[in-house]
UniProtKB/Swiss-Prot annotation:
An accessory protein needed during the final step in the assembly of 30S ribosomal subunit, possibly for assembly of the head region. Essential for efficient processing of 16S rRNA. May be needed both before and after RbfA during the maturation of 16S rRNA. It has affinity for free ribosomal 30S subunits but not for 70S ribosomes. Belongs to the RimM family. PANTHER family: RIBOSOME MATURATION FACTOR RIMM. Residues 101-178 form the PRC barrel domain. It comes from the Bacteria. Pfam families: PRC_RimM, RimM. The PRC barrel domain binds ribosomal protein uS19. This is Ribosome maturation factor RimM. The keyword Iron-sulfur does not apply. SUPFAM superfamilies: PRC-barrel domain, Translation proteins. NCBIfam families: 16S_RimM. It is found in: Cytoplasm. GO terms for molecular function: ribosome binding.
């Protein structure tokens, strides 16, 4: 394992190690990528947990619809693998594929101010949820927001009118009372 990872401000969390698998030092991974096996396309991972940062190399991986199993270079013991439980798996954003106009990664949307058609600040996007039919934005109140309500807004063409990353804003068609 290498102790010189990429700069922390360039890293995006794409998964999390949550357990061990078997006796050969493999780890179970929850992937935040879609499809989940895309996480295995990144061969060098930066692991972060509570101020601890380390870099590891992926040797092999496999999985199903729920989780992945990964073999990391130099990790051959179950007890050593157990120590990695809880680490977030990060990669530099520069490794992400380019998107077309109008497409965004979730990390780009998190933190955007959400403004309705009347110009009212509803809050900021805290995180997104995958629901099956469409993604859902969890909008939490912030300084200057209309009220102190948490809102769940669908990430759909009907709801999202415009995204301005430079301004840090998203315009939505949404009734503030809903």
């Amino acid at each position: 394992m290498n102790a010189t990872p990429a700069p922390a401000d360039d890293l995006i969390v794409i998964g999390k190690i949550y357990s061990v698998h078997g006796v050969r030092g493999e780890v179970k991974v929850f992937s935040f990528t879609d499809p989940i096996k895309n996480l295995l396309d990144y061969k060098t991972w930066t692991l972060k947990r509570e101020g601890s940062v380390k870099q590891v190399e992926l040797v092999s991986g496999r999985g199903n619809d729920k989780f992945l199993v990964a073999k990391l270079k130099g990790l051959d013991d179950r007890e050593e693998a157990r120590l990695l439980a809880g680490y977030e798996i990060c990669v530099p954003r520069s490794l992400f594929p380019e998107l077309t106009d109008g497409e965004y990664y979730w990390y780009q949307l998190q933190g955007l101010k959400v403004i309705d058609g009347l110009g009212q600040l509803l809050g900021k996007i805290d995180h997104l949820l995958e629901t099956g039919s469409n993604d859902v934005m969890v909008v939490k109140p912030c300084a200057g927001s209309l009220d102190d309500r948490e809102r769940l807004l669908p990430y759909t063409e009907q709801c999202v009118l415009a995204v301005d990353l430079a301004a840090g804003e998203m315009k939505v068609e949404w009734d503030a009372d809903f």
